[in-house]
Amino acid sequence: MSWQAYVDEHLMCDIDGQGQQLAASAIVGHDGSVWAQSSSFPQLKPEEITGIMKDFDEPGHLAPTGLHLGGTKYMVIQGEAGAVIRGKKGSGGITIKKTGQALVFGIYEEPVTPGQCNMVVERLGDYLAEQGL
């Protein structure tokens, strides 16, 4: 399966059978190279990936400044140290799951809930990790 198929079929999927889906998603290498993304995923800046990777290594690094992605600032909320970063902005937010080689991004807006975004992103992230990726 291509990386784009993982994004299209596992991240941009119908979450609840009602046609709801994430606003944007991507699979990105630890070096910031985009493996696949939805058409709506923002353009990443190298320093944003550097900051995200540092927060996985040093949990709490992004808390004072916020998480920036494509120039959008998210307030960092409770995640899982070294494994998941979660952010909030207004009625939407972001979940980032780290695997051995990749970062799985999901961005949501209402009516999708934080829990639904977490489930979609972390399920694919866990699967990729189990595959050694």
UniProtKB/Swiss-Prot annotation:
<keyword id="KW-0009">Actin-binding</keyword>
<comment type="subunit">
    <text>Occurs in many kinds of cells as a complex with monomeric actin in a 1:1 ratio.</text>
</comment>
<dbReference type="InterPro" id="IPR048278">
    <property type="entry name" value="PFN"/>
</dbReference>
<keyword id="KW-0020">Allergen</keyword>
<dbReference type="InterPro" id="IPR005455">
    <property type="entry name" value="PFN_euk"/>
</dbReference>
<protein>
    <recommendedName>
        <fullName>Profilin-2</fullName>
    </recommendedName>
</protein>
<keyword id="KW-1015">Disulfide bond</keyword>
<feature type="modified residue" description="Phosphothreonine">
    <location>
        <position position="113"/>
    </location>
</feature>
<keyword id="KW-0963">Cytoplasm</keyword>
<keyword id="KW-0597">Phosphoprotein</keyword>
<dbReference type="GO" id="GO:0005938">
    <property type="term" value="C:cell cortex"/>
</dbReference>
<dbReference type="InterPro" id="IPR027310">
    <property type="entry name" value="Profilin_CS"/>
</dbReference>
<keyword id="KW-0206">Cytoskeleton</keyword>
<dbReference type="GO" id="GO:0003785">
    <property type="term" value="F:actin monomer binding"/>
</dbReference>
<dbReference type="GO" id="GO:0005856">
    <property type="term" value="C:cytoskeleton"/>
</dbReference>
<dbReference type="Pfam" id="PF00235">
    <property type="entry name" value="Profilin"/>
</dbReference>
<dbReference type="InterPro" id="IPR036140">
    <property type="entry name" value="PFN_sf"/>
</dbReference>
<comment type="similarity">
    <text>Belongs to the profilin family.</text>
</comment>
<feature type="short sequence motif" description="Involved in PIP2 interaction">
    <location>
        <begin position="83"/>
        <end position="99"/>
    </location>
</feature>
<feature type="disulfide bond">
    <location>
        <begin position="13"/>
        <end position="117"/>
    </location>
</feature>
<comment type="function">
    <text>Binds to actin and affects the structure of the cytoskeleton. At high concentrations, profilin prevents the polymerization of actin, whereas it enhances it at low concentrations.</text>
</comment>
